A protein has these predicted regions:
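Mobile "lid/hinge" segments at catalytic clefts and subdomain interfaces of large enzymes
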Residues: 49, 142-205
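Short, Gly/Pro- and small/polar-rich lid/capping loops
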Residues: 1-24
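Glycine/threonine-rich beta-strand-loop-alpha-helix active-site module
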Residues: 129-148
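Metal- or metallocofactor-binding catalytic centers and their adjacent structured scaffolds
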Residues: 41-130, 134, 181, 209
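Glycine/serine-rich anion-binding loops at beta->alpha junctions
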Residues: 16-18, 101-119, 147-159, 204-205
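Catalytic core of soluble alpha/beta enzymes
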Residues: 201, 211, 218-391
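Short beta-strand elements
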Residues: 14, 24-32, 36-42, 149-171, ...
């Protein structure tokens, strides 16, 4: 082992995410001066089984400060990691897991472990003089993922828990990023003009998407279809339409309360039927409450020729939950978020299992994200089919 790769210094500090909330930044330096820096993102819509953030719950920053997390790094974790080779990511992450001893990082915090794990990965890539997208890359092809970009927002991203969370578009045909971004620009601006004309423009949601008032999911999808058509493109053939339902956010005691209307899983399925058959929706994420895997499987069985059923809260980037979903034939794609499980190693294990079973992986940002560009590197390095981001 090269002694120059040994971790010598771990620094941590409070920084702020895109919502202005405190989060954790970590820097790791090796003996020869190689370093990695990472910031932990934060989600507004979180799954029951994802890693828990450590917050202070005091008077500072509305209880969201991270001094406890910084103290855990400085006093509990850093002494265990200093002297370890940055190239040994598995051992690095296993130390974090062993210090925590829970599936949800209840003791050290998912925000703590995420920042540390990514910082070490970046430190190792710098030590090897390779960009992160090439370090431990699964392929030498460097294929860019298809971007899935938000046009409309709702749900937890817009303070409206009784609506679908994201309405997005993605390229079906091959096109350059420049061509696609131009389409996103034109579709978004066309949709905004329609909202303003009809007094339906309320503002923007957490991730930059349009936030309408007095419009339901059907009306929003109609606007997206019209806006795509105005770009002289065919919805559902050249540009795909996707929805993140985040159904757990409007579920309670067996009832889905959507726009103040109470529905069961069967009635919710009828809504998806119309969205798929008449409004060109070809990807639906978290269509049911995250513990109702049977409804996921039924929807997947009924519509798998027409639409991808995506698990986010259902899976939480956890190997064990994905294995169960595969056995139940519940999904054809999954969302990947590093801070849901809290380490690079656990994330890679989940991606590997997905690919072994022909499950597509969609690497996703969080609504409280940061200026950290690491996500883009990993989308390429790990061969993710898509990357999901805000506007």
């Amino acid at each position: 082992m090269n002694s120059d790769s040994l971790i010598e210094v771990i620094n941590c500090r409070r920084v702020f995410d895109s919502r202005g909330n405190p989060t954790i930044e970590v820097e790791i330096f090796t003996k020869n001066g190689s370093y990695g820096r990472a910031i932990s993102p934060s989600g507004a819509s979180t799954g029951l089984n994802e890693a828990i953030e450590i917050r202070d719950n005091d008077e500072m920053f509305g209880g969201k400060d991270v001094k406890k997390g910084l103290e855990i790094i400085n006093k509990k974790i850093a002494p265990q990691l200093v002297g370890l080779s940055c190239e040994n990511q598995n051992e690095f992450d296993n130390i974090l897991k062993n210090l925590d001893k829970s599936d949800q990082k209840l003791n050290i915090g998912g925000n703590v472990s995420t920042a540390l794990s990514i910082a070490n990965y970046l430190c190792a890539s710098n030590f090897n003089k390779e960009p992160a997208y090439k370090y431990h890359c699964n392929s030498n092809k460097n294929i860019l993922p298809r971007p899935e970009i938000q046009i409309f927002g709702g749900g937890a991203h817009a303070g409206n828990s009784k609506s679908f969370q994201d309405f997005l578009i993605y390229p079906i045909n091959n096109m350059t990023y420049e061509e696609y971004f131009n389409i996103v620009f034109n579709v978004s601006n066309s949709a905004k003009k329609k909202l303003i004309k009809n007094n339906n423009f309320f503002g923007y949601c957490d991730e930059g998407g349009l936030y309408p008032n007095d419009l339901n999911h059907f009306q929003i999808c109609e606007i997206i279809n019209e806006s795509i058509t105005e770009c002289k493109l065919v919805p559902g053939k050249e540009i795909g339409i996707s929805i993140d339902v985040a159904a757990s956010n409007f579920y309670k005691d067996g009832i889905y309360t959507l726009y103040d209307k109470e529905l069961d899983a069967s009635e919710l399925t009828n809504i998806y039927d119309k969205l798929i058959k008449t409004l060109n929706v070809s990807l639906i994420e978290d269509p049911f409450q995250e513990e109702d895997i049977i409804s996921f499987a039924n929807l997947q069985s009924q519509y798998n020729q027409f639409v991808s059923i995506v698990g986010d809260d259902l899976i939480c980037t956890r190997h064990d939950l994905l294995k169960n979903a595969i056995n139940q034939k519940a999904v054809s794609a999954i969302i990947i978020k590093i801070n849901q499980c809290g380490t690079i190693t656990e994330t890679l294990e989940t991606i590997k299992l997905a690919k072994q079973n022909n499950i597509k992986t969609i690497l996703s940002a969080r609504s409280g994200d940061t200026e950290d560009s690491f996500l883009s590197h990993l989308a390429i390095a790990w061969g993710n089919e898509m990357i999901k981001v805000g506007s």
